[in-house]
Swiss-Prot record:
Alphabetical list of InterPro entries matching this protein: Aldolase_TIM, Alpga-gal_N_sf, Alpha-glycosidase_related, Glyco_hydro_27/36_CS, Glyco_hydro_36, Glyco_hydro_36_C, Glyco_hydro_36_N, Glyco_hydro_b
Gene3D superfamilies: Aldolase class I, alpha-galactosidase from lactobacil brevis, Golgi alpha-mannosidase II
Active site: 504, 566
EC number: 3.2.1.22
Name of this protein: Alpha-galactosidase 2
Enzyme class: hydrolase
Amino acid sequence: MLGAPSPRRLADVLAVTAGLVASVRAASPISVSGKSFALNGDNVSYRFHVDDDSKDLIGDHFGGPATEDGVFPPIIGPIQGWVDLIGRQRREFPDLGRGDFRTPAVHIRQAAGYTVSDFQYKSHRVVEGKPALRGLPSTFGDAGDVSTLVVHMYDNYSSVAADLTYSIFPKYDAIVRSVNITNMGKGNITIEKLASLSVDLPYEDFDMLELKGDWAREGKRLRRKVDYGSQGFGSTTGYSSHLHNPFFSLITPTTTESQGEAWGFSLVYTGSFSVEVEKGSQGLTRAAIGVNPYQLSWPLGPGETFSSPEAVAVFSTTGVGGMSRKFHNLYRKHLIKSKFATQMHPVLLNSWEGLGFDYNDTTILHLAQESADLGIKLFVLDDGWFGVKHPRVSDNAGLGDWEANPKRFPQGLPDFISDVTKLKVANSSDHLQFGLWFEPEMVNPNSTLYMEHPDWAIHAGSYPRTLTRNQLVLNVALPEVQDFIIESLSNILSNASISYVKWDNNRGIHEAPYPGLDYAYMLGLYRVFDTLSSKFPNVRWEGCASGGGRFDPGVLQYFPHIWTSDDTDAVERIAIQFGTSLVYPPSAMGAHVSAVPNGQTQRTTSIAFRAHVAMMGGSFGFELTPAEMPEDDKAQIPGIIALAEKVNPIVVKGDMWRLSLPEESNWPAALFISQDGSQAVLFYFQIRANINNAWPVLRLQGLDASAKYKIDGNQTFSGATLMNIGLQYQFNGDYDSKVVFLEKQT
């Protein structure tokens, strides 16, 4: 029975909590006292307890450290009149059908058709470190990095078990949660909904910050008031999507980039997802994130277990920027498995925007030679290199036939790649590296693969198979499709000197044959990602989905870089990259200099401006044909490369401070500070010319107030001066930019 706590139980809880709070500073990351639990980070506390009567898990606190020696306020205040008390409770795992009419975290359909659940606490265990999720991407860490609490719950009426796993990364004020559901009964059940994380916050005045967009305009910030009732967003596309990102933040109305409280939530998943925020009638706000229930309905037989993806929640008292830096550092160090996560990225040139499908071995080798002569270190051959019977000379044929086109590469792809990697990079002892584009999850009907295996394409019975970009999606939920992809790419990567792979995905899933296909597809895709990235650890993997359609933590587990957007216009990219950095580290962002007028916006900006914007991404490069560039621009490329190589280590490993936002200012700016604080680089932009007005003063952040900093090797100022008084620069005309280096003096 759920209801108000008895006076005896409330007194017991308060007494236990008082003792728990008094020892916070000396406590381990996870403290357990009786049936009260506390996860303690450097600047966060997450607390809940077991209700004595209902055996439900009741939330006590998620926010700053609770260091008061007294007691917590009552969980439920005095009640007057006839009220449904469950609507006032802060529940950790809200179920369905027993009087809590708010958004549930779990919805299970039993064999008899019942959808009521009654999960009660049974036991718990604490482990050092963090177990990996089976078949799903997940954060990782050793015993000194992370601790884990597993709470075992059970529904005695349906014989269904739920294990709630909480992990705490104290250094990053990050709580990670996932749920396992196990059918312990004799009949089948169906999981209709399972949120990875659901939390009730005892405040009702929030703004919600999220990332919205579409193709070529991903990652745009949206801040809106959390109003009464339910609101949310998600994806039903079969991938995380351009339209929304599996991330949101709840912030107070007064929270800014650098001040105020921010709760951030991020789902480690690549498929369709759902975010739900509900402002209730009793002063609570419920927030939940997980797999989209419209694409779940997962059958679970006796003895079977379903695992949710994990969700990451961080808390910051230093504004939205503080929240972002916690995500950045956690994901760089405890999510991305690749050794390239924090390594300097070689400057690359991608063939796509320069040549498209129109090339042969001679033109490609010439472009590679031009690249090497300019000092570029990695040449990437994009779409169009494959297909024997159905050559990929346009987007209507060849996908799925991963063999080199013999007409384009008569000596064979391995020998051609060997010719490319023999090229000497100018002003360097290096030879040119080679990268290759794939779209392994797709198939053209005009291909040998489709003609041999039409059943491998996702389809729903006799319904027409909808084409997008002249292609269909392979059913990666099938083990034979997974094996085909692994074998096809392994054959190519094992027989040629390929150091980089761009993995593309250019459409969503249509005509799914059953609701749970999306989740099954993701399990198969993660198996493919894990197998290939483990088998070829010396390959740099970069994800892409028509740009940033799959920029999510699930992909980042295996691929250290993701192409941020197909929009390479520098002005648009400032907003896209600033927005994406709300949760994702700039080290993961692919950002390139393309030709002008820009292919997406037709805007013309200087090559310096384009390059400075792109340098804010960890994977910096070019998408153009050097031979078609103006000579003045071409002459600047060696200097741009030298600057990019100087900037890149700070961007890849450092902390980002967004000083001025593109949606709020004509002068957006970001400061990157190295982890040891010894160096910093400032990116400062003017969008439109400033007429008859004073130049803005930019105050820096994140510096050591007592230290001295040399600015571009010239003047020296204290950190206090730079943060409290600031810098002032003169800009010239539209689309001007500055890159400024700061060096801490010892």
